[in-house]
């Protein structure tokens, strides 16, 4: 039956005799078979018996079966098929319920799957499924590891902004290093397309009264400020309808700050949030209330109430000066000092606060005078930048619309030594963590340690591939790639006792079991003979950081079989990410990266699942993937 269908599908292509590799590739595409051209080239060569660069219809059928008839899928099919030829509708129902854990299952779902994936018409009409149909279903998006529930906005978006992790970039204008690299609009466009919701704009005085964007005091190229925000306006809401925050690093004179203010108003129009929303004059609004809005994050003169009193007044030509304590950057001491007992709640005496300052190494400050155009200042509503001094100071004096920027070195020390106080701080105030200045190569830190304490804006260099950006992309797959992910309740509760370094004994851990079955057309290495292995990593609170590795399958990147089982006990699954990495074992220069996939642990489907692989730059490597079986219980 399947042979008859196959011959019917391809015979016209062989009317002229044998076909070339190019025609074979087109025919595979016609049959809806995704394949890696390099793999097909080697398979074609092996099956071209006369070595003439042309194959017969029988040779093509052999190639087709090598690519599509995977042994592990045949084994599953035969387990549920009564005659090893056809799945009855009831057989498919049994498979879906027992193996795929389709909890909201009804019989019509099985019927819909047959109608959608069964290519042989007479089989479809009989409400049955051939192996061809079953294989197509198993290779479809319905059998991906990522739960499609998480593929759309499903979380409550009416909480205040402080209750969300927000996808954030650092030095968004750069597409290379921070000393010589070019500034490019593509930095902003690509970040927005990926769902980034907080962009950084370094603004400096330019010629002809036109502010420019670049990395100051370096050889990086320059962009016009107005050109940057025009690009942002075009792409801001293509990937997500939720608010975009423009974090300004403002080094401009008051006159050019006015130019910036005028450009912002002219470019964004009503989308620019220049006044408080109704009912949100004393608390932060939600992403839902701020849909399709642009927020300016910058220093600000005076209070929000004073801004509202000036509503409608022309602020052009008006400049205010204030004195700010500028941080004198210090190196991390790297002493690895023993973690002291964390300080108590904010009502504890100031002696403990001073003790924490000495242990953590709160940076030194010096006075600095800053001039700000009132026209620009008044565009800052809910995201005023306020210098961070201490948790105690913020508790006493910081206002709801004031946010902090903390360098990674200081933030890391605070995370290790005062995690609970950090969580209580991020519960009330938006906190942005950014890479230290020494990262001239635009490298990134591990964002997980700052998500663990509730930091909303963990800003990374989006242009730099690697594990940190894999975690970033995986984290924000959740909630429909909207750029906003609701923080777990224990990071939002004002009475929280959560400490990522001291997970309570009565936590509710998740036991995760993954059976790594096989690889599917992994990116081929030298001569298509990669020695393939897979690493499965968990990122989360310190106790959840772990990884396991498969054995090496020699000289096989096309269809390696492992059949190995890994088990993880995850204490805080709400914060955990899982990363799958395929590598080619290297004996001298280290392992060669082949592909990876990262996603939140709680966004995984159970059952037989396909893990799509992505390149270092985050590009899809389809059809390269892993085939696994997932089970977890809590």
Curated annotation (Swiss-Prot):
It is an enzyme of class 3 (hydrolase). It is found in: Nucleus; Cytoplasm, Perinuclear region. GO terms for molecular function: calcium ion binding; phosphatidylinositol-4,5-bisphosphate phospholipase C activity. Residues 321-334 have a biased composition (Acidic residues). Residues 312-345 are annotated as: Disordered. Its main location: nucleus. The active site is at 170, 215. Disulfide bonds: none annotated. Residues 35-70 form the EF-hand domain. SMART domains: C2, PLCXc, PLCYc. Interacts (via its C2 domain) with PtdIns(3)P and, to a lesser extent, PtdIns(5)P in vitro. The EF-hand and C2 domains are essential for triggering Ca(2+) oscillating activity and the regulation of PLCZ1 enzyme activity. The X-Y linker region between PI-PLC X-box and Y-box domains may be a target for proteolysis and may play an important regulatory role during fertilization. The production of the second messenger molecules diacylglycerol (DAG) and inositol 1,4,5-trisphosphate (IP3) is mediated by activated phosphatidylinositol-specific phospholipase C enzymes. In vitro, hydrolyzes PtdIns(4,5)P2 in a Ca(2+)-dependent manner. Triggers intracellular Ca(2+) oscillations in oocytes solely during M phase and is involved in inducing oocyte activation and initiating embryonic development up to the blastocyst stage. This is 1-phosphatidylinositol 4,5-bisphosphate phosphodiesterase zeta-1. It comes from Bos taurus (Bovine).
